[in-house]
Amino acid sequence: MAIRETLKGGKGEVIKNPKVFIDPLTVFKDIPFREDILREVAIAVRYFVKNNMKFSTLFLGLTGTGKTFVAMYMFNEIQEVKKEDGEYGVVSQAYVNCREVGGTPQAVLSAITQRITGEEVPKHGINLGEYIERIKENLVDKKALIYLDEVDTLIKRRGGDIVLYQLLRANADISVIMVSNDINIRDYMEPRVLSSLGPTIFFKPYDAEQLKHILSIYSEYGLIKGSYTDEILSYIAAISAKEHGDARKAVNLLFRAAQLASGEGMIRKEHVDRAIIEYEQERLIEAIKALPFHYKLALIASMQASDVITAHKIYSDLCNEYKQKPLSYRRFSDVISELDMFGIIKVKIINKGRAGGIKKTIEVADKEKITKALEEAMQLEYEDTV
């Protein structure tokens, strides 16, 4: 009977509208604490559409500071304005998450071209210039506003900043909004690319009070009244504020805590604490997916070895398998130390005495989760190479 009540969403339910947490743009009519940024971007877009003033800007800030939210909100608002203002009818928009499409110059340009032209475009077999030409051909008497989310994935690839340069300097009405949480992203760009960039807009971390306000909006629209307390919202906000004011983390914790409280009618501290543990585990998986290729190979080797010397031998074999030049033992040892620093593996140094020297052992906790993350990550690496 309890399962039937759960299926029907009966007594003790906490979540009123889960879509609020999955697609918040359907709820938020404005974005709190980011109004000035929205206004600045809206003015740039208006000048672009009505006065032919192209622009480019970089949204820069730590994870969960509202960069993607602002970009997607602007995208949606422009789509609505197109219905009301004829001058916006000539604007085509392309929103591309560089990491999700693969991150290579070809993959990103293919996605942009497809969204602008509405035609299927191959990821391989076409040079970069041809993608740009196809976009330009489609923009005769038209304008394009291109959003490049997680643009650092593209920039750090060979030839990635050339893509930006070609877009920014193309003889066409193209404006670009880029999003990155790597505060050092500009260090990866060539001087000619930097000189083509417009202003950088910095997104400051939210403080605890701001996070609590944001959570109150999600709670109002997404949770059943009386299923949460002001203290619970403050608790989640305080935890998230300690970690660079991450609103995404705060919202995810609230939603997961609400799911854990389903059937009990009230979100309690124990639900939030369980949600925190799960969140940290999921973050570990995402961190593994974001590792450079040789770090992934080093981690695979570490899963199969008990010490660093053996791991390096396995790693070297993997490099041969993937047709990669292996890192030296010294550099490999540095990579292992970094993986230890990230908390993905644990390295112990055993002193075997004057005759035995020093041995570095490797321990890997939660191998099942790490193996799953590695399988997904290596599949993405494989797709990039075919």
From Swiss-Prot:
Gene3D superfamilies: 1.10.8.60, P-loop containing nucleotide triphosphate hydrolases, Winged helix-like DNA-binding domain superfamily/Winged helix DNA-binding domain
InterPro entries (UniProt xref): AAA+_ATPase, AAA_22, Cdc6_C, Cdc6_lid, ORC1/CDC6, Orc1/Cdc6_arc, P-loop_NTPase, WH-like_DNA-bd_sf
Stored CDD domains: Cdc6_C
GO aspect biological process, one term: DNA replication
Keywords: ATP-binding, DNA replication, Nucleotide-binding
Residues given in the record as ATP binding sites: T65, G66, K67, T68, F69, Y206
Superkingdom assignment: Archaea
Pfam families registered for this protein in UniProt: AAA_22, Cdc6_C, Cdc6_lid
GO molecular function: ATP binding; ATP hydrolysis activity
Known role: Involved in regulation of DNA replication.
Similarity comment: Belongs to the CDC6/cdc18 family.
UniProt-listed HAMAP family: ORC1_type_DNA_replic_protein
Protein name: ORC1-type DNA replication protein 3
